[in-house]
């Protein structure tokens, strides 16, 4: 894995552990809802992760973008498909999404380089 991917995954894992130590019942339910919402249903996991990525880009949440990029990569989304996802996110979100698009491409490239 590349540096960006390793740093993000390490920090996320560390802080998820910390959060789980202190989270109250309501927060635990919210986190469980997030997990179960992305499970297979009428839409498959792959589609839900692509939707999550578009929403994350439009909302300009870099951590969320990285998370969904990783999940999309794990679900076998191709670079061609990813480029179309980026187009939709920029169309919906407007030019303010472009800085997040740049970082998303950099992160996606690292994910793809790790395959080789």
Question: What feature does the model see in each segment?
Answer:
Residues 83-107:
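C-terminal structural segments of small proteins and small subunits
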């Amino acid at each position: 894995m590349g540096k960006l991917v390793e740093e993000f995954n390490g920090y996320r894992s560390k802080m998820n552990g910390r959060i789980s130590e202190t989270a109250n019942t309501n927060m635990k339910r919210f986190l469980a809802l997030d997990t179960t919402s992305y499970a297979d249903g009428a839409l498959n996991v792959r589609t839900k992760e692509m939707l999550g990525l578009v929403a994350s880009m439009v909302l300009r949440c870099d951590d969320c973008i990285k998370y969904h990029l990783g999940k999309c990569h794990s679900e076998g989304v191709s670079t061609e498909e990813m480029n179309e996802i980026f187009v939709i996110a920029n169309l919906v979100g407007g030019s303010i999404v472009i800085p997040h698009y740049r970082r998303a491409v950099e992160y996606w490239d690292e994910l793809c380089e790790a395959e080789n």
